[in-house]
Each structure stands twice: as C-alpha cells, then as structure tokens.
C-alpha cells in the first residue's frame, strides 16, 4: 500500500490508497428489509485476507474505486456503499469463502434487471485481488420486486388460457434444429401436436436463416396449430422464436405472431439481453401472448463451480424480467442437474415464498409478494422411461419437453407424440391412485404398453439409452 498524504488545500481529505476493509467490511451491520443481499463465493489471491477480498467485492460493485477521490466528500458513502457484513469458509474447499454483501436499494434503477446486474456483477469479476468469484444467490427485497412487471401471465393464467389442468404439459423441440424448409417444419409441428402434445418448439438458434425465413415459419406453424386444434379439440401452441438482431425486429415478429392468433412466442433471454427480454415481456402481457424463455448461453456463465453465476440467480433475474416458461434442467437425461439444487431454483421460479435452505442452495429467504410464477421446462435427452421420475420430481406445474424422445420414434413423429402422451397420462393416473412413481415407475410404463403399441415401440427403442460420461473436472 502506498502512504496516504494529506494535501495542503484540504481539511480531512487524504490522497492515496487505503485498504477496502477499513470502509467496506462492516461485520456489525444489520441488514435492512430494503437491502439487496448477495452471497459471493470468493477465492482470494494468495496473501489476500478474506476480509479484504470481501470488502473489495462490496466496494467495486458499489461506490468504491482503487484510490481515495475528492468527490467522496460530496456524497454520503455510508448511505450508498455496499457492505460486506459476514464471511464464512466454504466447507471442504481450500481458500474459498462465502462473502455476504448488502447493497442499499437506492443504488439501482427501478424495474431494470440490466442495471441490477451491471452494478453487482458488471465489473468486479476481473478484479486482480481475486483468483475467482461466483455469485451464488441474491435476495431481492419486495420493495424492489414491486417495480417489476415480471412474467407476462404466470402459471394459473396460462392454464386458464389453455384449459388444461391436473397434469404437466408436454412439449417437443422440432429436430433437426436447422436445415428444414418452412413447409416441412410445419408438417413436423402438425404431426406432433396431432399426436397429443400441447406444445412444439423452435430451437434456440432458429431465427431467420436463408433456408427458413421467420415469416414463412410462422405461417406454416400457425396452419399446423389450427389444423391440430380442429382435429383434437385441444388448444395447441408452438413456441415461435421472436429473438432477433434488434429489439425493433423482435417486436415486429411478436406483432405478426399476435396477428396470426397463436398463443405463445419465445425468446433467448441471455443472448438477446435483459433489456430486450423485458421489452418483449411487456408486449406479451399487453397483447395476450404467453412467453417461453430459452436459456441459451447459461452454461458459459453458470457451469464453473467457483466462478461466474449460479443459475438460481439467472432464474430470479428472469422472473423479474419476465417469462412464462424457462428451461431448468431435468435431473435426469443428458443435461442432468443435482436434484435438490435443481428443485431449489424450480421452487424459486414457481412459489410465492421460499425459505432459506442451504441444503438446496438457497442462501436467503425470498418473498416474491404478488409476482406471477414461471413454469419450469424439463428438456434434454429425456424419453418415455423418464416419465415417472419427471412427473414425480417436477409435479403438475411444469412442461416436459421431449425432442429426440418424440421425433426419434421408429414409427414417426405422431406415434412418438402418442407414446409420450400415453406415458404421461398413465403416470398421472397412477400418482392420483396413490402409487409410488419412484418405486413403481417402470411397472406403470410397462402396464400402459399393453394398451398402446406406440408406447411399446418407444420403450423398446430407448430401453438401453443412458447418458453416462466420466467427469473430467
């Protein structure tokens, strides 16, 4: 540290560098109901005390900079500064600490996830005093939550729009994700919806490419939806991806979807950005469209255990920004997640009030007040044999999305959809009869095969499929 030097022209101002912990480490601080609270996993550089590292995070993500400045005297730092108020070691990890930081609410623009993240994680992750930094959780106070619209509609309104109750919803991502013409794409949509699915879906990178422009896709998918609805008597939907290179183009696509009368559109909220996502969510609420959210790019941010951001933070941010569905892992299949941790952020998406529970990765009690809930979407390498586990784990307020598990059926797309619908109905009936899906799942599926040759064929194809890869990190 360089020495502090008092200038002749000042009284009380000392130029130079001082330790962050002298100002920003305040273990005596009592948090306020209006504070935004953050739990950071901090890995300091060798020789940096955890108190200094935690204080540095609080400083660099709020009012601090690397040196004392004249203009500190023109405001009240005690009112606006972030505070590291508690530090605890991470069990089983060397030189890792959970540092809790409290931010005054006045630091953040109302109704802006963009500003919230710019402040809390925008700059501090490149700080030299830290080897690694991960934002594990945020507590969003009700006073700040009430400045957001949140999901366009929420779980109950979606069920009322679809007139579907008492079971999970079924979906399918159209494959191959790229390369189909708009007409062939629409054909696949029709076959899946006609077979019994509630939704089909554009993949995250289906936007408006030379082989299939967005307007053509929207038209053929709308035709497929209306034809399937007429033949089944059920309300159907296809997640029309409105993600685009500009907000203006995105809204233009959403407007066209509304004019076609379809029930739902889609957005890639991380690659598209929170400003674009909130803009689209507001449009969807005002115009009666449901909004499906894909989390493309999330693993770039959340996969490393000691650096980045946990998905529960991204999930909370999405609930603030707005979305009626979001992909949330499966616990089974090719994109597995730890069961308790996954269910922790699933509850944060759906429930009005979630208690602190460190065993489930929930660092803070979260009260969502009246903000609508978000339906979690389970997708990625799942098939009919997973249906009992998925029904038990995710419950009714979920979307179970089978891409290859529908389109990979040996008899075609529609039989694949039939197989999934029969498997789901069998699991829901068994659950309602009091049977244990975890213990009797395979038996329940085999019994249903007697009444559905489509399900029997699917069970035969996928009976040996597992996604088991040795962990290398």
Swiss-Prot record:
Residue numbers binding substrate: 123, 173, 177, 295, 327, 379
GN (gene name): rbcL
Name assigned to this protein: Ribulose bisphosphate carboxylase large chain
Role noted for this protein: RuBisCO catalyzes two reactions: the carboxylation of D-ribulose 1,5-bisphosphate, the primary event in carbon dioxide fixation, as well as the oxidative fragmentation of the pentose substrate in the photorespiration process. Both reactions occur simultaneously and in competition at the same active site.
Processing after translation: The disulfide bond which can form in the large chain dimeric partners within the hexadecamer appears to be associated with oxidative stress and protein turnover.
Subunit structure, as described in the record: Heterohexadecamer of 8 large chains and 8 small chains; disulfide-linked. The disulfide link is formed within the large subunit homodimers.
UniProt keywords, alphabetically: Acetylation, Calvin cycle, Carbon dioxide fixation, Chloroplast, Disulfide bond, Lyase, Magnesium, Metal-binding, Methylation, Monooxygenase, Oxidoreductase, Photorespiration, Photosynthesis, Plastid
Residues the record marks as active site: 175, 294
Modified residues (N6,N6,N6-trimethyllysine): 14
PANTHER family: RIBULOSE BISPHOSPHATE CARBOXYLASE, RIBULOSE BISPHOSPHATE CARBOXYLASE LARGE CHAIN
Location of this chain's protein in the cell: Plastid, Chloroplast
Record keyword Nucleotidyltransferase present: no
Its EC number(s): 4.1.1.39
Something else known: The basic functional RuBisCO is composed of a large chain homodimer in a 'head-to-tail' conformation. In form I RuBisCO this homodimer is arranged in a barrel-like tetramer with the small subunits forming a tetrameric 'cap' on each end of the 'barrel'.
Gene3D superfamilies from the UniProt entry: Ribulose bisphosphate carboxylase, large subunit, C-terminal domain (3.20.20.110), RuBisCO large subunit, N-terminal domain (3.30.70.150)
Catalytic activity as recorded in UniProt: 2 (2R)-3-phosphoglycerate + 2 H(+) = D-ribulose 1,5-bisphosphate + CO2 + H2O; D-ribulose 1,5-bisphosphate + O2 = 2-phosphoglycolate + (2R)-3-phosphoglycerate + 2 H(+)
Family membership noted in the UniProt record: Belongs to the RuBisCO large chain family. Type I subfamily.
HAMAP family attached to this UniProt entry: RuBisCO_L_type1
Binding site for Mg(2+): 201, 203-204
Domain of life the protein comes from: Eukaryota
A biological-process GO annotation: reductive pentose-phosphate cycle
NCBIfam families: PRK04208.1
Molecular functions (GO terms): magnesium ion binding; monooxygenase activity; ribulose-bisphosphate carboxylase activity
Main enzyme class: lyase
């Amino acid at each position: 540290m360089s020495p502090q030097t008092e200038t002749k022209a000042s009284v009380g101002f000392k130029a130079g560098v001082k330790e962050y912990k002298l100002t920003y480490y305040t273990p005596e601080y009592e948090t306020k109901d209006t504070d935004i609270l953050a739990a950071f996993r901090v890995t300091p550089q060798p020789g940096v005390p955890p108190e200094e590292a935690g204080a540095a995070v609080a400083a660099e993500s709020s009012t601090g900079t690397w040196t004392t400045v004249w203009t500190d005297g023109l405001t009240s730092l005690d009112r606006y500064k972030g505070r590291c108020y508690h530090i605890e070691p991470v069990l089983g990890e060397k030189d890792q600490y959970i540092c809790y930081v409290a931010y005054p609410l006045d630091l953040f623009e109302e109704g802006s996830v963009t500003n919230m993240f710019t402040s809390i994680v925008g700059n501090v992750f490149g700080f030299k005093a830290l080897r690694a930094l991960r934002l594990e959780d945020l507590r969003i106070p009700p006073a700040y939550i009430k400045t957001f619209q949140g999901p366009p509609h929420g779980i109950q309104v979606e069920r009322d729009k679809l007139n579907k109750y008492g079971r999970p919803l079924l979906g399918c991502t159209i494959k191959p994700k790229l390369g189909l013409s708009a007409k062939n794409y629409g054909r696949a949509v029709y076959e899946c919806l006609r077979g019994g699915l509630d939704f089909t879906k554009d993949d995250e990178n289906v936007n408006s490419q030379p082989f299939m422009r967005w307007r053509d896709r929207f038209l053929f998918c709308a035709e497929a939806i209306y034809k399937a609805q007429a033949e089944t008597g059920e309300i159907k939907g296809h997640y029309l991806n409105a993600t685009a290179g500009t907000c203006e183009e995105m809204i233009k696509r959403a407007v066209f979807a509304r004019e076609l009368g379809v029930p739902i559109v889609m957005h890639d909220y991380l690659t598209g950005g929170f400003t674009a996502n909130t803009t689209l969510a507001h449009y969807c609420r005002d115009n009666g469209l449901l909004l499906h959210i894909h989390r493309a790019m999330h693993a770039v941010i959340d996969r490393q255990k000691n650096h980045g951001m946990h998905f529960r933070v991204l999930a909370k941010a999405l609930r603030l920004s707005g979305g009626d569905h979001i992909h949330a892992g499966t616990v089974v299949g090719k994109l597995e997640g730890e069961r308790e941790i996954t269910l922790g952020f699933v509850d944060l998406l759906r429930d009005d009030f979630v208690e602190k529970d460190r065993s489930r990765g929930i660092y803070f009690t979260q009260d969502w007040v009246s903000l609508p809930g978000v339906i979690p979407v389970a997708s990625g390498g799942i098939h009919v044999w997973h249906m009992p586990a998925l029904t038990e784990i995710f419950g009714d307020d979920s979307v179970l999305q089978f891409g290859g598990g529908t389109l990979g059926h040996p008899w075609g797309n529609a039989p694949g959809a039939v197989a999934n619908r029969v498997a789901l109905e069998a699991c829901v009936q068994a659950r309602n009869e009091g049977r244990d899906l975890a213990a009797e799942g395979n038996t329940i599926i085999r019994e249903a095969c007697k009444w559905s040759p489509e399900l029997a064929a699917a069970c035969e194809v996928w009976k040996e499929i597992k996604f088991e890869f040795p962990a290398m990190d």
